[in-house]
Amino acid sequence: MAEFTPITIAYGDGIGPEIMEAVLYILRKAEARIRLETIEVGEKLYKKHYTSGISEESWESIQRTGIILKAPITTPQGGGYKSLNVTIRKTLQLFANIRPSVSFHPFTMTLHPHLNLTIIRENEEDLYAGIEYRQTHNMYESIKLISHTGCEKIIRYAFEYAVKNNRKKVTCLSKDNIMKFSDGVFHKIFNEIAKEYPQINNEHYIIDIGTARLATKPEIFDVIVTSNLYGDIISDVAAEISGSVGLAGSANIGQHYAMFEAVHGSAPDIAGKDIANPSGLLNAAIMMLVHIGQGDIASLIENAWKKTIEDGVHTADIYNEQNSSKKVGTKEFAEEVTKRLGQIPTKLPKADYPLIAEKQESNIDYKIDTNEVKKLVGTDIFVNMNISSAHDIADKINKLDLGNIELKTISSKGLKLWPRDTRFETISDHWCCRFMNKDGTEIKHLDITRLLEALSKANIDFIKVENLFEFDGVAGYSLAQGE
C-alpha cells in the first residue's frame, strides 16, 4: 500500500481559497499520495487579534507534518502586525527561498523567450528581521542583520542546487561597494565557497546593474544567489518578464521543514471572481511533490499543465489573441489540466522528476568562529538634540569630565559634521557621537556606563549605544563620510 505524506494546507486570503481549491482538485485527480491537514491563517486570525496571523493549533499541525502548502495571505498595513510569511520562515528556519522563472514562449507573451533561471534568496536575515525603532521625532531606524553562518548556508545551498540541477553558473548580487560589512561578508563568502565548486562558473554583480541586466538580458543568468530584500525584489522582476507573475511558484526550504507558495500576492481586488490564475500555486505544489519524493505525480501534473498552456487554454492574465484559443476561469483551468493528465507537451520541455525525496545536507556543521581576538575600542552614542550645529553639541560634551575618554567625531546620517573647519548646519535631531580613549587603548564597559551617567547628568538625551570593536586588529565599524 502506498505511503501517504501528511501536508498542512493554508487557504489564505483574497484569491487564496479559490486557487487552493483548484490546485487540490488537480492533486486529487492526479492521485497524489498526500494526507491533508487544513489550518486557518492570515486575515481572519489578524482580526481575532493574533498579531502574527497564526494560532498555536496551526503551529502544531505544521510541526506534525513538516510541510506547508500555503496560498497567499493579506497582511494588514500599518503598525502592530507582523508578516505571516516572515514569521513562518524565521520560526521554522526556512533559510532558502527558491524561485524558478521560466519563459513559456511562444505560448505566453514575453520579450525573453530563452529565460530560464532560478533565484536563491536568503530567507531569515537582512532588513526582513523586522527590527525597527523610532528614535526621535524625526528619525526612524531599520536594522540590517547579516551573519557569517547565514551567508554560508544560503551560498552553499545555491552551489549545491546548481550541481543537482545541472546548472552551469551561479551569480552573486550584493551592494558591497556601499555596505562594506553586511554585503561585504556576503560577497566574501561567495568567493570562498565558489572555489569548492570549480565545475560551476561564478560571477558577481552590484545589485543595481545586476537588476538592470536581469530586466533586459535575463538569458545570461542561470542561478542567482542574493540576500533577502534584493531577492524579494528581483524574483518579482524575473517572474514578471517571464510572462506573468501568476505562473511562478516558490519553495522555502529548511533543515526540518519546508513551505511552498505562489510568488504573487492575495489580489483581493479580483477575489471571488473566478478569474485568478492558479498556476503559481500549482507550480509550488509540483515543487512540493518533488521535495517529498513523488516525482511521478509531479511530472504527471507538470506535463498536463504544460500541454494545457500549449493548447492555448489560458486564464485572463496570459490570454492573447495570437497564442490563446480559449479564455477560462480558475475552476475551468483546473478542469482542463486534469483532462490532459497523462499527456505530454510537444514543444515545451517534458518533466521527468526522480522518485527520491530531497534532503538537506546534514554533514556540514555551521559554527560561529570565535578565534578572532575581539577588542572594545570605543562607543558610538546616539543622542536626540534638536539643534542645527554639531559644534554646539561638541561644546556641551567637551565641558564634561570624561576621564580618559574623549569625543572623537559627531556625525548625522553617516556624514561627519564635527570636527570641521566650517560650522556646517543641518536639519537633524539625531546625532552620532563617537568616543574613544585619548591614548587609543582598549576601553571597559564600566567606562561606557560612566560616560552615559555623565551625559545623563548634563541632560543629554542618549537614545542608543553601539559599541566599537576590533577583530584581530581590524576595525569592525564603519567611518563616517569625511572621517
From Swiss-Prot:
Pfam families attached here? Iso_dh (PF00180), Isocitrate_DH_C_bact (PF18324)
Coiled coil: which residue ranges? none
Q: Where is this site: Critical for catalysis?
A: Y128, K175
Which cofactors is this protein said to need? Mg(2+); Mn(2+)
The answer to whether keyword NADP applies is yes
What the entry lists under SUPFAM superfamilies is as follows: Isocitrate/Isopropylmalate dehydrogenase-like (SSF53659)
Q: Which UniProt keywords apply?
A: Glyoxylate bypass, Magnesium, Manganese, Metal-binding, NADP, Oxidoreductase, Tricarboxylic acid cycle
Assembly information from the UniProt record: Homodimer.
Q: Which PANTHER family match?
A: DECARBOXYLATING DEHYDROGENASES-ISOCITRATE, ISOPROPYLMALATE, TARTRATE, ISOPROPYLMALATE DEHYDROGENASE-LIKE DOMAIN-CONTAINING PROTEIN
From the Swiss-Prot or TrEMBL record, give the protein name.
Answer: Isocitrate dehydrogenase [NADP]
> What is the species of this protein?
Rickettsia felis (strain ATCC VR-1525 / URRWXCal2)
Q: What is the lineage of its organism?
A: Bacteria, Pseudomonadati, Pseudomonadota, Alphaproteobacteria, Rickettsiales
